Amino acid sequence: MASSTVESFVAQQLQLLELERDAEVEERRSWQEHSSLRELQSRGVCLLKLQVSSQRTGLYGQRLVTFEPRKFGPAVVLPSNSFTSGDIVGLYDTNENSQLATGVLTRITQKSVTVAFDESHDLQLNLDRENTYRLLKLANDVTYKRLKKALMTLKKYHSGPASSLIDILLGSSTPSPAMEIPPLSFYNTTLDLSQKEAVSFALAQKELAIIHGPPGTGKTTTVVEIILQAVKQGLKVLCCAPSNIAVDNLVERLALCKKRILRLGHPARLLESVQHHSLDAVLARSDNAQIVADIRRDIDQVFGKNKKTQDKREKGNFRSEIKLLRKELKEREEAAIVQSLTAADVVLATNTGASSDGPLKLLPEDYFDVVVVDECAQALEASCWIPLLKAPKCILAGDHRQLPPTTVSHRAALAGLSRSLMERLAEKHGAGVVRMLTVQYRMHQAIMCWASEAMYHGQFTSHPSVAGHLLKDLPGVTDTEETRVPLLLIDTAGCGLLELEEEDSQSKGNPGEVRLVTLHIQALVDAGVQAGDIAVIAPYNLQVDLLRQSLSNKHPELEIKSVDGFQGREKEAVLLTFVRSNRKGEVGFLAEDRRINVAVTRARRHVAVICDSHTVNNHAFLETLVDYFTEHGEVRTAFEYLDDIVPENYTHEGSQGHSRVPKPKCPSTSIRKPASDQESGQETRAAPRHGRRKPSEKPPGSHVQSQHSSSANGSDRTGGPDRTEHFRATIEEFVASKESQLEFPTSLSSHDRLRVHQLAEEFGLRHDSTGEGKARHITVSRRSPASSGSVAPQPSSPPSPAQAEPEPRAEEPVTVVQAHCPVQLDLKALHLERLQRQQSSQAQTAKGQPGGDSRPQKASQKKKKKEPKGPVMALPCEEDFDALVSAVVKADNTCSFSKCSVSTTTLGQFCMHCSHRYYLSHHLPEIHGCGEKARAHARQRISREGVLYAGSGTKDRALDPAKRAQLQRRLDKKLGELSSQRTSRKKEKERGT
């Protein structure tokens, strides 16, 4: 062993750990000194206003207390937080700063948190159900001390079973050639070829083997098989992982195989299903359990006698007896522990739980033959050295393409602390020590292909059983547009759904994306997908809180977490909200590629990504994700979900050719495969953009595509000139004929209908979309002289603004475009089409008549009877552009109220809800028709900030009954004290007289 190599490695690791420790301590100190309790809660390290919901005695006399948020509604959930099972927490009274007790968090759900307190707290801890408490995550000194001790042991390690392994792991020597092993008889007969090869490889290696398991490839199944085969060969196995959850997962799997297993660790940190395998539980069932209990009872009795006697000689005798009893107790307990450890085939613990200051110190140094470290890529390298020093061979399993070890210090992470042992060894030794699992059993082919190409060099494939499965294949789920696509991109670019810019907060939120998530989940649930099969993943705690406020009451089974909370998990459908939407193009820690990989690969059948492509495309990796979804999935704009959004490029300025924001290069329309083509397998979408995968090269199960627009002139955004020319030729034939109406089939996609709308406007024809869902179709007809839906081409000179027609009524949407000029109907046309569809539906409901063409005719007749005031321009052709500009300027400087023509140049206000200007007498939202939107906005703001503003209503001052009763008791107690003081003073006066 090269001592210089070991010393330099240990020195570097100790320095990095010191940086991490200092950063953690400084962070905690800064939080407590400069952050309010509410800010601590927003950071996820504190839970406020908790009430005791239940108390019970847990395993081995521990006191388990369950806390819940104070209930002000039917269903209250905990705010988004970073608490996990096993964390050390401090308990505080809400009205005091002193710490009441320290406990271990055993379980946390969306509605409650359970903490285990030791027996020592039973006498001092008196929790009142009517009081409120808070929990604060505390720094764990034990872990840091154990990591430091392991590195110092490595530095002093000269001879022992792990000497050769240490040289290989630190690069002083190379791994030995693999051994020849006989053919294996596998316990699990369903293993695929790559899994069997990985098992054989791990057993044949003499010192080091690495099992690389991408998402869904059955890594844990392979690790369990390796452990079983090692036990079959008579080897003693120490199995570790960085987290309690990962260890318990292995315990559950091994317990099914009827092997003798022993789980080390605090019982409060273990899952209830594995607690009977813990060391404490095994000791309680051992032969020495009764003897140990008798010795403890004798010690208690001698203590009692010692307190009662006053004789010094007797006290001395009692102390000597207690000393002897304690010595016997220690010997008996150690003998029982050694017996339990040696009787086990597999000993399991966390990396730090395998330290030498625990039960393993009772075993010989060379007791274990092999160490298995699962989820090694998530562990700090220093923590892996705790178990690695106990055996001559190690098997590492994990995926260094997923989440790295969690660190606080950015400086330490950049210096190498976030680089795992597995990642370092895989890069150094390559295929000589690594075997990759290549068949995944989780994801649809389209989902898998992106992860395979982006992160794993295209090396793993889908098993046929999952390659084509979709949500619609689940029992009770109907075939809808949402359940038949594996990939869905909902693009918010140009829709004005910007992220929240919270001051003094590092967290981000996006209420617009929350609304989109809510609508998409409702569509999935309506189709029959169970809420428990859906996961919503957000990168920021603030967004998680907003999502829970919107969804948890209606869908309590729905899981809403950050990316870190879903590592190793899977769901049938996953919705990703990227949150970031800003004009600077900042993506924050979305730039961490491995986090995105984890988020996408949690899904089995359906992934929906909600993002602003204009923002996220500033990061190369995210751009590849958007491009892949665009090419192989379905792309929709946010306007297909939200009717009341005014896009950023849909402004008065934009109509003058001076858009306030650059035109997004993301797709703005949804391109879907019609139902008839879905059944026949025919493709109706446009050809892909140059440089992308062609339709024939698409993976199985991939869906239709939409292309980015590289032009800004509103041309066809999906390529597809053949389809456009086909529609143009059809309309030209109709114009040349004597027919009055042309109907297009229902098989047209929404984007095809958009093309027809554009062409109809260009030819000056009337165009209406009627019907719902698959029955929706578009009808093109000739304009009647009285029709004023949009301006037809006019050979004569354009009319002046003074001669323009009166503005149509607000409830009669009118598409105003420039004839024979480049039209930009993208999002605006789609929005107007949706409005027309809604009004048509309302007219059918009111009159009980089919929509068809009756609505435009009645609108025209109604307009003849009563023409409201308000100038509107008939847009001229490009020959007289000055008239167009003057008309638009005049309209922009006139009150937008339907019966008002007062100028707003001097006295006017802009409405944030409808993006129009109004005179002062009409600017209130309740007057011009935005009352509901204003109230909704106020409610949302109050809910988010927790502050009542002037005009937002009166605060409910009614006290909670429990709180009122508590205050009443305090008042009665105080009055009693004052009354007794008055009585005593009165008696003193009487005595004085």
UniProtKB/Swiss-Prot annotation:
<keyword id="KW-0539">Nucleus</keyword>
<dbReference type="Pfam" id="PF13086">
    <property type="entry name" value="AAA_11"/>
</dbReference>
<dbReference type="InterPro" id="IPR036867">
    <property type="entry name" value="R3H_dom_sf"/>
</dbReference>
<feature type="modified residue" description="N-acetylalanine">
    <location>
        <position position="2"/>
    </location>
</feature>
<dbReference type="GO" id="GO:0008094">
    <property type="term" value="F:ATP-dependent activity, acting on DNA"/>
</dbReference>
<dbReference type="GO" id="GO:0008270">
    <property type="term" value="F:zinc ion binding"/>
</dbReference>
<dbReference type="GO" id="GO:1990955">
    <property type="term" value="F:G-rich single-stranded DNA binding"/>
</dbReference>
<feature type="binding site">
    <location>
        <position position="441"/>
    </location>
    <ligand>
        <name>ATP</name>
    </ligand>
</feature>
<feature type="compositionally biased region" description="Polar residues">
    <location>
        <begin position="837"/>
        <end position="847"/>
    </location>
</feature>
<dbReference type="InterPro" id="IPR014001">
    <property type="entry name" value="Helicase_ATP-bd"/>
</dbReference>
<dbReference type="GO" id="GO:0043022">
    <property type="term" value="F:ribosome binding"/>
</dbReference>
<dbReference type="GO" id="GO:0030424">
    <property type="term" value="C:axon"/>
</dbReference>
<dbReference type="GO" id="GO:0042802">
    <property type="term" value="F:identical protein binding"/>
</dbReference>
<feature type="binding site">
    <location>
        <position position="402"/>
    </location>
    <ligand>
        <name>ATP</name>
    </ligand>
</feature>
<keyword id="KW-0007">Acetylation</keyword>
<feature type="binding site">
    <location>
        <position position="928"/>
    </location>
    <ligand>
        <name>Zn(2+)</name>
    </ligand>
</feature>
<feature type="region of interest" description="Disordered">
    <location>
        <begin position="953"/>
        <end position="993"/>
    </location>
</feature>
<keyword id="KW-0694">RNA-binding</keyword>
<feature type="region of interest" description="Disordered">
    <location>
        <begin position="765"/>
        <end position="815"/>
    </location>
</feature>
<dbReference type="InterPro" id="IPR050534">
    <property type="entry name" value="Coronavir_polyprotein_1ab"/>
</dbReference>
<feature type="zinc finger region" description="AN1-type; degenerate">
    <location>
        <begin position="889"/>
        <end position="938"/>
    </location>
</feature>
<keyword id="KW-0597">Phosphoprotein</keyword>
<keyword id="KW-0963">Cytoplasm</keyword>
<feature type="short sequence motif" description="Nuclear localization signal">
    <location>
        <begin position="862"/>
        <end position="866"/>
    </location>
</feature>
<dbReference type="Pfam" id="PF01424">
    <property type="entry name" value="R3H"/>
</dbReference>
<feature type="compositionally biased region" description="Polar residues">
    <location>
        <begin position="703"/>
        <end position="716"/>
    </location>
</feature>
<dbReference type="GO" id="GO:0043025">
    <property type="term" value="C:neuronal cell body"/>
</dbReference>
<keyword id="KW-0862">Zinc</keyword>
<dbReference type="InterPro" id="IPR041679">
    <property type="entry name" value="DNA2/NAM7-like_C"/>
</dbReference>
<dbReference type="InterPro" id="IPR000058">
    <property type="entry name" value="Znf_AN1"/>
</dbReference>
<feature type="compositionally biased region" description="Polar residues">
    <location>
        <begin position="667"/>
        <end position="683"/>
    </location>
</feature>
<feature type="compositionally biased region" description="Low complexity">
    <location>
        <begin position="784"/>
        <end position="794"/>
    </location>
</feature>
<dbReference type="GO" id="GO:0043139">
    <property type="term" value="F:5'-3' DNA helicase activity"/>
</dbReference>
<feature type="region of interest" description="SS DNA-binding">
    <location>
        <begin position="637"/>
        <end position="783"/>
    </location>
</feature>
<dbReference type="Pfam" id="PF21138">
    <property type="entry name" value="SMUBP-2_HCS1_1B"/>
</dbReference>
<feature type="modified residue" description="Phosphoserine">
    <location>
        <position position="797"/>
    </location>
</feature>
<feature type="modified residue" description="Phosphoserine">
    <location>
        <position position="800"/>
    </location>
</feature>
<keyword id="KW-0547">Nucleotide-binding</keyword>
<feature type="binding site">
    <location>
        <position position="914"/>
    </location>
    <ligand>
        <name>Zn(2+)</name>
    </ligand>
</feature>
<keyword id="KW-0820">tRNA-binding</keyword>
<feature type="region of interest" description="Disordered">
    <location>
        <begin position="650"/>
        <end position="723"/>
    </location>
</feature>
<keyword id="KW-0687">Ribonucleoprotein</keyword>
